[in-house]
A protein has these predicted regions:
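A well-structured
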Residues: 1-281
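Amphipathic alpha-helical domain-onset/packing element
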Residues: 283-285
Length: 285
C-alpha cells in the first residue's frame, strides 16, 4: 500500500526533511516487478514534481525582492536540508530502477538520461552544488540592487532601459553612461563571486572524474546529440556569415540616423525617428 502524496505542494512548503523520508523509503523498499514498475515510476515522478514546485516557490521568492533576507534563508534551507537529501535518495532510486531491468514503454530517451545522471553523481558534489546556487543568488542580489537617480526617482537599471528607445540622443547617452557607471561600482564584488564560482565548478568537475567544468556541464545538460567541437564549428560559421551581416545592419542604422559614429546608446532607438509605443502605463490600464 503506497503512502498518499499531498494533493499539492502548498502543504509541503514548511516541511523538514523528516517529512519527505517516508515517501522515499516506500519507493526504495518496494520490490519492483513488471506489473508495478509503471505505477512506481509515476509515484516517483509525482513526488519529484511536488518537490520541484516547493523549490520553485522558494526560489521565486528570492527574485521578487533580492533584499528579502527571510526569502533568502528559506531558499538556503531548502537547498541544504531538502535538495541535497533528495538528490542523494534519487540516486539510490535510479540505481534501483536500472538494476531491476524493467523499463516502461517508450522510455529509451529518459533511460539514457538517467544512466547519465547516475554516472555523473558524486556525493561530494552535493554541498558544492548548493554553494554554486548560493553564489549565483549573491550575484542576482548585487544586480537587483543596482539603482540610479533618474528624473528625481530611484529606478533600477531595467527600469532605466526604456530611455534607450527615446529619440532624445543626449538623454540616451546620459542614461547609458549612468547605468554603465553604476555597474562598474560592483565590478570587484562580481569578480570575487565569479572566482568563487569558478573554483567551485572546477571541484565539481574533478569530483565526477571530468577534466574541466565544460565537459561535466555538457553531460549534466544531456547534450548527447552534438559535441563541443560542433558548437565551435557553428561559432566559426556565425563569425563568417552572420558577423558581416550584423556589421552591415549597424552601418545601415548609422546612416539612417545620420550619425558620424554609432554609439551603444544608438542601438535601440527607432531609425525613422518615431517615439516608442506606449501600449499601457500600469497593470490596471
Amino acid at each position: 500500500m503506497s503512502i498518499a502524496l499531498p494533493k499539492n505542494s502548498a502543504k509541503m512548503k514548511d516541511w523538514s526533511w523528516d517529512n519527505y523520508v517516508p515517501f522515499f523509503d516506500y519507493l526504495e523498499d518496494l520490490d519492483l516487478s513488471s506489473s508495478n514498475v509503471d505505477e512506481w515510476m509515476k509515484y516517483w515522478s509525482d513526488l519529484s514534481e511536488l518537490i520541484g514546485e516547493v523549490g520553485t516557490s522558494v526560489y521565486i521568492s528570492t527574485t521578487v525582492d533580492t533584499t528579502d533576507e527571510e526569502a533568502k534563508a528559506r531558499y538556503h534551507k531548502f537547498l541544504e536540508e531538502i535538495s541535497e537529501n533528495v538528490s542523494s535518495r534519487n540516486q539510490k532510486l535510479k540505481i534501483k530502477f536500472l538494476e531491476s531491468g524493467f523499463s516502461p514503454d517508450n522510455f529509451d530517451i529518459p533511460l539514457r538520461g538517467m544512466k547519465s545522471e547516475v554516472g555523473l553523481f558524486s556525493e561530494k558534489n552535493l554541498p558544492l552544488l548548493t554553494s554554486d546556487a548560493k553564489l549565483s543568488k549573491e550575484y542576482d542580489a548585487i544586480i537587483g540592487s543596482q539603482t540610479v537617480r533618474w528624473e528625481g526617482e530611484e529606478v533600477t537599471l531595467t527600469q532605466l532601459s526604456p530611455v534607450m528607445l527615446k529619440t532624445d540622443r543626449k538623454n540616451r547617452e546620459k542614461a547609458w553612461k549612468m547605468a554603465a557607471k553604476r555597474r562598474l561600482e560592483d565590478r570587484q564584488s562580481i569578480n570575487e563571486i565569479w572566482i568563487k564560482i569558478l573554483k567551485t565548478r572546477m571541484s565539481i568537475a574533478k569530483n565526477s572524474g571530468y577534466g574541466d567544468y565544460r565537459a561535466w556541464r555538457w553531460e549534466y545538460l544531456k547534450r548527447f546529440d552534438y559535441t563541443p567541437e560542433d558548437c565551435l564549428t557553428f561559432h566559426r560559421s556565425i563569425e563568417k556569415v552572420i558577423v558581416p551581416l550584423a556589421d552591415k545592419l549597424l552601418k545601415n542604422r548609422k546612416e539612417a540616423l545620420g550619425l558620424e559614429k554609432l554609439k551603444p546608446w544608438d542601438l535601440s532607438v527607432d531609425i525613422y525617428g518615431r517615439e516608442p509605443l506606449s501600449p499601457f502605463k500600469d497593470a490596471g490600464e
